[in-house]
Swiss-Prot record:
GO term, biological process aspect, one: tetrahydrofolate biosynthetic process
Species assigned in the record: Streptococcus pneumoniae (strain Hungary19A-6)
Protein name: GTP cyclohydrolase 1
Any Pfam family matching the protein: GTP_cyclohydroI
Molecular function GO labels: GTP binding; GTP cyclohydrolase I activity; zinc ion binding
Source species taxonomy: Bacteria, Bacillati, Bacillota, Bacilli, Lactobacillales
Pathway the protein takes part in: Cofactor biosynthesis; 7,8-dihydroneopterin triphosphate biosynthesis; 7,8-dihydroneopterin triphosphate from GTP: step 1/1
One CC-aspect GO term: cytoplasm
Keyword field: GTP-binding, Hydrolase, Metal-binding, Nucleotide-binding, One-carbon metabolism, Zinc
UniProt subunit comment: Homomer.
Length: 184
């Protein structure tokens, strides 16, 4: 990540909006923003493979659900945050991931400029590709600051997105069971 370019760009934005980039409260802002971007965009170029490849053998194939995984990310359209909760269900095929690995999967894909729909897809596809699940179902509920702070200005509006893979695509009863277990 080119932090010098980020700092220069932030200084230009500060000046472009009519502020003095050298005043006391803004002098360190370009460096702060560059450090923040290093942190919140740390998922760029990463996949969840390293997390999901550490799995455990299991002999049954009962559904695993992890819900209320808090995340925050940046909308790639306005570079404003959106945040919420991800709910994950999957059907193992002989292997299960450690529970923290599901949260880490959400984290990897949320640490980059993102849209909610793609975040759903990336998490579900990672479960299928790297864990070898028989099915994956991901529901994300989020509030988007680009809707709350600007434009339509409707704070508190929740956007829900879903994606189903494998067995969840074809089995409505299985999806319904996942919804119930997720409390949705």
């Amino acid at each position: 990540m080119d932090t010098q370019k980020i700092e220069a760009a932030v200084k230009m934005i500060i000046e472009a909006v009519g502020e003095n980039a050298n005043r006391e409260g803004l002098q360190e802002t370009p460096a702060r923003v560059a450090r923040m971007y290093q942190e919140i965009f740390s998922g760029l170029g990463q996949t969840a493979e390293e997390h999901l490849s550490k799995s455990f053998e299991i002999i049954d194939d009962n559904m695993v659900v992890e819900k209320d995984i808090f995340f925050h990310t940046m909308c790639e359209h306005h570079f404003l945050p959106f945040y919420g909760r991800a709910h994950i269900a999957y059907i193992p095929d002989g292997r299960v991931a450690g529970l923290s690995k599901l949260a880490r999967t959400v984290e990897v894909y949320s640490k980059k400029p993102q849209i909610q729909e793609r975040l759903n897809i990336e998490v579900a596809d990672a479960l299928m590709d790297y864990l070898g699940a028989k099915g994956a179902f991901v529901v994300i509920e989020a509030e988007h600051m680009c809707m709350s702070m600007r434009g339509v200005r409707k704070p508190g509006t929740a956007t829900l997105t879903t994606v189903a893979r494998g067995l969840f695509e074809t089995d409505k009863d299985l999806r319904d069971q996942a919804y119930r277990l997720m409390g949705l």
